[in-house]
Amino acid sequence: MIFEGNLGVRFMTIVMQIGCLVVTWFTINKSLRTIQTTYLFFIVSFASVMFSAYGFITTPDAPLLFFTALFLFGYKEYVESKNLTTSFILIIAATGLVYSKYQGLLVIVLVILSNLKLLKNTRFWVIAITTLILITPHLYWQYANEFPSIKYHVLARATAFKWGFVFEYLPNQLATFNPFVIGAAVFVMYRYKATEPFEKALYYIIIGFIAFFGVTTIRGHVEPHWTVAATIPMILILVNKSTTDTKLATYIKKYIGSSIILLLIARIIICTTLLPERIQFHSKQQKYLATQEIAGTRPVIYSGSFQNPSLYPFFTGKNSTVISSLMSRITQFDLWKFQQQFQTKKAFIAMHVDGKSNTYTSKSGMKIEGFYVDSLQTTDHIRFNFDVKNILFSKAKTVEMELSITNSSNHEFIMDHRELPARIEVVWINKKDIICTPCIITRPFASIKAHQSIKTAIQFVVPDVNLENYKLGVSLSSIFGPSMNSEFVTIETK
């Protein structure tokens, strides 16, 4: 980092926000860049709630917004003059979009859909192929890790349909963009038909983002900020049309401008301790320093949340990781296999476990819950393989199944570990509904040596549920919960 501490983390976010504003400004036609337009541009930009927030909140949305602005700038120039410079800008922007967030791919697709004539242009294909080459390392990483992002977004996040997901979507979008901003954008798109390819692309991105994520509410909760990339085209169409529509210009000054007062109040509140501790932007350091005081030189192991093991080393400079389970989301810590470096090492487990955890008080008086272990053992490196093709499942039936177990780590795995024992469970998953069934190991084993594979068998009773809706997997369960140790397969029922 260029700077230490919070500024070091947020510095590039600030730079990208400034860059995003500059690039967006230069996307406006030169003849329209007047003092009046400048005034309206900054009103709309500052009043766009999440766009403004990502000027100081460091997330992948900051580069997403920057590269969206750069891509639209490049596309506008490309439409007007297909030269080498605009092609280079589009290649850099498209690559940056994909690496920032997968929503960036939607920006690219919607622009192409708005102008299918691009598909007949040789230079377009040169840009597309070059971009594909630049993102090949990421595609290979996805392949090497069994496409974790796709599995997470397509499968893991899917839940049963709830009307609540649908009904919350529109209010969340109003909060994301500012009701006055999105309302004006909808009015402009309804009132003025897009007549040029670039303007058409702006309309497609706005409508496409809101429609696409609106449809995805049928499979689960949609985070409000997932549509934030549509802010850039909203700013552009409002500022562009305000130069010829005096009523729109007045509306921007009077209503969108007035809403900035509420945003300023919100920013002031953020600077205080009035918000719940979980979402405060400061005062977090004390908790992690207190945890480090209790943990000493031992790495701190968290469960479930990726925020804690990220913030702990940031504030203390000490090691930390998270142990995920089927009850929580897969994190970057899992993909990087952070847990492996702490296997068999002393550690402090910062979580509540009945009969194990204690409450410790730091010198500052802060209470920290957790317990010490002298030899950490996790279950994420154990892999189960099984075949259910010849098994017919029915409710309450006792099933015996062959099981192949592989230990991919450099350390022996002990089932009856003195501090962190594990047990095999059969797991039934129906979207977010998870049922764990205990099983009997009919050919018992005490441990699995490093890089060893063994064969055994388990016996379990099928749960009394509608089996057609569930997939079956096998998991190792510990104090951290059932871990992801196998594929989940469809079963045959009678």
What is each of the regions a protein language model found here?
Residues 30-35, 71-86, 194:
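Membrane-interface transmembrane helices that cradle and orient dolichyl/undecaprenyl
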Residues 85-101, 131-133, 213:
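Membrane-interface alpha helices of multi-pass inner-membrane proteins
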Residues 24-47, 65-66:
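Transmembrane-helix signature of polytopic, membrane-embedded enzymes
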Residues 74-81, 94, 106-132, 161, ...:
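Perimembrane helix-loop-helix junctions
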Residues 116, 175-196:
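Hydrophobic, aromatic-rich transmembrane alpha-helices
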Residues 53-63:
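Short acidic/glycine- and proline-prone juxtamembrane loop motifs at membrane-interface regions
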Residues 11-32, 70:
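Transmembrane-helix motifs of polytopic, lipid-linked glycan transferases
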Residues 250-297, 305-322, 326-327, 350-353:
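Membrane-proximal, lumen/periplasm-facing interface regions of secretory-pathway glyco-
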